[in-house]
Amino acid sequence: MSSVVIEVADLDVYYGTSQILFGVGLSVRQGETMALLGRNGAGKSTTMKAIMGLAPPRRGKVSLRGALISGRKPHHIARAGLGFVPEDRQIFPEHTVEDNLVIGKKRGPEGQDEWPIKRIYEVFPLLEPLRHRIAGRLSGGEQQMLAIARTLMGNPALLLLDEPSEGLAPIIVQRIGELLRQLRSIGSTVLIAEQNMHFCLGLASHATIIDKGQIVYAAGIDELKANEAIRRRYLAL
C-alpha cells in the first residue's frame, strides 16, 4: 500500500467566535487524486487554508509524510512540500508567463527537481507559445493553467487546488480536467477542493464530502458514482 502524504486529524477551526470546522479528518496517499467535495460554504476552502497554515486550527493536527506541520507558518509549510493554488490564483500579472514560472522554481524538500521548465511545457503545451506574454493579459483558463504550472515548479509532495474550475467556461474546465487526469497518470498527489462534482468524478481517484464543517462521507470515486443517495443529499444544488 502506498504511503500517506498528508494526514489531517480532528481539526477545529474558528473565524473569530464562529466555529467553521468540526473535527475534520482526511488523508491522501501517494499518487492519489482526492476530491474534497461539498456545497458552497461547506468548509472546503477553510480546510485547505487550515492545511496551509492560513487558518490555524484551535484543535487537531496536520502531518506531511509523518512530520507535524500544523502550527507552522505558511511559508515553512510550503517549503516542507505543499504547493497551494488558491481560488484567486495569485499569479504575478505584470510579469511574463515564463517569468512567473521561474519565480516559482525551487527544488523539493529532498532536493528533487521533477519539474524542470522543459517538462512543464510538455505537460502544459498551451503555455509554451504564450511564454513571453504578460500574465495579466491571459484568459482566466490560461491563468489557471499558469498558476498550477508555477506551483508544480516548486516540486511539491502534494498539490492543493482550491476550486480550480470556478468561473471558467465549460471548454476550459474540460481542459483543466484533462490536465489533472494527466497529472494523476504520472503519479502526482493532488487534493482538490471543488463544488463542481461532475468535474471531479472524471478525474479523482477518491472523494471526501464535507457538509456544514464536518466530514460526512469518504470513499473511492467509483463508490461515490454508484451512490446516488449520497450525491443527492450532500452535493445536489
What are the residue ranges of the model-derived segments?
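ABC ATPase NBD coupling module
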Residues: P56, L68-R89, P93, D113-I117, ...
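Helix-to-loop junction immediately C-terminal to a conserved catalytic motif
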Residues: M52
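ABC ATPase C-loop
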Residues: T151-L152
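Catalytic Walker B motif of ABC-type/P-loop ATPase nucleotide-binding domains
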Residues: L159-E163
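The feature captures the beta-strand-to-loop junction immediately N-terminal to the Walker
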Residues: L37-R39
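ABC-type ATPase nucleotide-binding domains, specifically the catalytic core motifs of the NBD
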Residues: G16, R72, V97-W115, V123-E128, ...
